[in-house]
Amino acid sequence: LFHYCQCQCPPGFKGKFCQFKLRPP
């Protein structure tokens, strides 16, 4: 999940925040 988010989210976002924002379906 963290990897997926880090790749999809911009560098400005943190892995944790991204995980919740762009959580895979």
Curated annotation (Swiss-Prot):
Gene3D superfamilies linked to this entry: Laminin (2.10.25.10)
PTM description: Contains 2 disulfide bonds. However, cysteine pairing is not critical for peptide binding to melanocortin receptors, since peptides with different pairings have similar potency at the receptors tested.
Organs and tissues of expression: Expressed by the venom duct.
GO cellular component: extracellular region
Main subcellular location of this protein, as a coarse class: secreted
Signal peptide as annotated in the record: none
Locations listed in the record: Secreted
Entry GO MF terms: toxin activity
UniProt keyword terms in alphabetical order: Disulfide bond, G-protein coupled receptor impairing toxin, Secreted, Toxin
Domain of life assignment: Eukaryota
Primary role: Peptide with nanomolar affinity for human melanocortin receptors. The natural disulfide pairing being unknown, the activity of all three possible peptides (with the cysteine pairings 'bead (I-II, III-IV), 'globular' (I-III, II-IV), and 'ribbon' (I-IV, II-III)) have been tested. All three isomers show similar affinities on each human melanocortin subtype (MC1R (~500 nM), MC3R (~100 nM), MC4R (~50 nM), and MC5R (~50 nM)).
Miscellaneous comment in the UniProt entry for this protein: Many analogs have been synthesized. Among them, the linear peptide Hunger-Toxin (HT1-0) shows an increased affinity for human melanocortin receptors MC1R (200 nM), MC3R (40 nM), and MC4R (15 nM), and a decreased affinity for MC5R (200 nM). This analog also binds to type-2 angiotensin II receptor (AGTR2), but has no effect on type-1 angiotensin II receptor (AGTR1), vasopressin 2 receptor (V2R), and the five muscarinic receptors (CHRM1-CHRM5).
UniProt domain comment: The cysteine framework is XIV (C-C-C-C).
Protein name: NU-conotoxin-Ltg1a
Species in which this protein is naturally found: Conus litoglyphus
Organismal lineage: Eukaryota, Metazoa, Spiralia, Lophotrochozoa, Mollusca
